[in-house]
Amino acid sequence: MVSGKRIADVGYRLFSGSMMLLTVYGGYLCVVRAQRYMQRKKQLELAAQSENTASEIIKE
């Protein structure tokens, strides 16, 4: 027969494992979001820079 302590140990390990997976997944989502933010920021800066260059050419 399986003792209560054994069941508690297995439950604790399962819970700990699921928390580790959630932490890793959360970190992954955070990194992906930060990467997208930086990429979007770079695109906006390039668009603004090209717009400024185009307006300078028109003014001349």
UniProtKB/Swiss-Prot annotation:
Record-linked InterPro entries: COX14
> Where is it mainly found?
mitochondrion
Q: Does the keyword Metal-binding apply?
A: no
Task: Spell out the protein name for this chain.
Answer: Cytochrome c oxidase assembly protein COX14 homolog
Q: Which UniProt keywords apply?
A: Membrane, Mitochondrion, Transmembrane, Transmembrane helix
Q: Name one Pfam family in it.
A: COX14
- Role this protein plays: Plays a role in the assembly or stability of the cytochrome c oxidase complex (COX).
Which compartments is it annotated to reside in?
Mitochondrion membrane
Q: Which cysteines are joined by disulfide bonds?
A: none
Cellular component terms per the entry's GO annotation: mitochondrial membrane
